[in-house]
Regions:
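Acidic-aromatic/histidine active-site loop/patch
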Residues: 30-75, 79-85
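A glycine-anchored, Pro-Gly-centered beta-turn/N-cap motif
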Residues: 74, 249, 326, 331, ...
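Short coil/turn motif common to extracellular beta-sandwich-like domains
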Residues: 72-75, 247-250, 369-376
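C-terminal soluble interaction/assembly domains
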Residues: 274-299, 304-307, 314-317
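C-terminal outer-membrane/trafficking sorting elements
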Residues: 355-367, 371-441
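Short solvent-exposed strand-capping/beta-turn motif centered on an Asx-Ser/Thr pair
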Residues: 81-86, 217, 256-260, 380-384
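Extended terminal and domain-junction accessory segments
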Residues: 4-40, 110-262, 269, 274, ...
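Beta-strand-rich interaction surfaces with strong enrichment in secreted/lumenal proteins
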Residues: 66-68, 114-118, 240-243, 290-305
Length: 441
């Protein structure tokens, strides 16, 4: 399902801004010197429609073939998402210039990190600064130097036939052609030396170390085919939660992979800090807040020799969004692998809140009732709040669904036809439900 949805274009960026970032001397004129880039590739049918395959033959940048853009002769910021179904991109510029990485998945780094190449795996995000000062009238290409990728990294394979064969495999290719124009007013012309101070998690404060495994499915009974990859020796089961994580737990997750292939591992709910990859501390560009980490394939191996597994450790604090009913996912960010069952789930539980509130009635009032515009909700217990609200009509048809609703300004029901409706609230802490009736006149 995920592969199909991504193929059809369901994927993009949300740009989050705050007062700390806005105080820095960074480009932020959207579309001028602050440019989002979603990288992906597609295969086209003879009728010019997307086909659902792991690798495409054509590079698309912001869903544009042979993309090009004009940028000013100054420092330009690119916010880049690898939105590919499977492929990693070894980013670099055609003239070998350096560029500065200023963020990882979860926000700003302590300082810009200057590189000439950077491998961005599926689902990962970075922001980079490129200094084009004094280069008006010239051009340069952002490229994928995928001929340099190892054969067990997505995009580094070179299959001539079969479902993974593609024109771009193990090749270098253009991502974006940049035409450099005139400098703008109030241009940023230098890259800052420092950014912010991240306070990272301390391994000594971990409450537990959880050990996960990644493996190939070959030879295992009841697992689909030799091309499937699995987490913790099982396929995904929507009715099974692998872990119950207490709210406010600080945890080390240690992932050991005997898979020959590398996998970008993604976790929902939290941002984490990488502790080590095969015993080595993360690079400066990987030392910030992350939610995707690349788990390398094992090294060595052959007949009678299983090879040496790779081991990646990260640390995270699960300090919000406790919900014993609705789990969070962790999975490979290669969509095909995820769809084949390379995924697990966990719940974050707040036992104190449940114990305090499980026997507490949900006392709530709706006003004005009847209404034809806004409907306001008031909890009698100030410690209670809405986790989820559903509005249905008298036939049971769902008309409104509001996860984590903001209730201060009321719920707009002006679009509802005149009649009787039922509003069901799931309370945020106890997860108990209550239903109230209101009238739209």
């Amino acid at each position: 399902m995920t592969e199909e949805q991504i193929t059809k274009g369901i994927g993009g960026l949300i740009i989050v801004r705050d007062s700390i970032e806005s105080a820095l001397a960074l480009p932020r004129s959207y579309g001028v010197d602050d440019i989002p880039l979603v990288l992906t590739d597609r295969d086209f049918s003879t009728s010019n429609q997307f086909t659902m395959v792991p690798y495409g033959d054509s590079m698309l940048t912001n869903m544009t073939l042979r993309a090009q853009y004009q940028v000013p002769a100054q420092v330009v910021r690119f916010r880049i998402l690898n939105g590919a179904i499977e492929r990693s991109y070894n980013l670099g510029f055609s003239d070998g210039r350096s560029f500065s990485i200023i963020t990882s998945d979860g926000g700003l780094l302590n300082a810009p990190v200057s590189v000439t190449k950077y491998i961005l795996h599926a689902g990962e995000r970075i922001e980079i600064l490129v200094n084009c000062s004094g280069q008006s009238g010239t051009s340069v290409d952002l490229k994928a130097y995928n001929s340099l990728l190892a054969g067990n990294v997505a995009g580094g394979e070179n299959f001539n036939n079969g479902p993974f064969a593609n024109y771009l495999g193990k090749k270098d290719f253009n991502i974006l052609h940049l035409n450099i124009g005139a400098q703008t007013a109030n241009a940023i012309t230098t890259i800052p030396k420092t950014l912010i101070t991240n306070i990272l998690l301390n391994s000594a404060n971990a409450n537990i170390t959880r050990k996960l495994t990644i493996s190939d499915s070959a030879g295992l009974p009841n697992i689909q085919g030799p091309n499937a990859f699995i987490l913790n020796h099982k396929l995904f089961n929507i009715n099974y939660n692998e872990y119950q994580v207490p709210l406010n737990n600080t945890e080390i997750w240690e992932i050991t992979s005997s898979s020959a292939f590398g996998h970008p591992f993604h976790i929902h709910d939290v941002e984490f800090n990488i502790i080590s990859v095969n015993g080595v501390a993360p690079t400066a560009a990987q030392a910030g807040w992350k939610d995707v980490v690349f788990i390398p394939g094992k090294t060595g191996g052959g007949p009678g020799n299983p090879g040496t597994p790779s081991v990646v450790k990260f640390i995270a604090k699960f300090d919000d969004y406790a919900d014993a009913l609705h789990p969070f996912m962790y999975h490979c960010h290669i969509s095909l692998h995820e769809d084949e069952g390379m995924m697990g789930q966990f719940v974050v539980t707040n036992q104190n809140a449940v114990a305090d509130l499980k026997n507490t009635d949900i006392l709530v009032s709706l006003y004005p009732n009847p209404t034809n515009n806004k409907l306001y909700i008031e909890f009698k217990n100030q410690n209670q709040s809405a986790y989820y609200i559903t509005i249905t009509d008298v036939l049971g048809r769902t008309k409104v669904m509001l996860p984590k609703p903001e209730l201060l300004n009321g719920i707009d029901v002006s679009h509802l036809s005149k009649g009787i409706y039922h509003l069901t609230i799931i309370e945020n802490n106890s997860k108990q439900t209550t239903t109230k009736t209101f009238v739209v006149n």
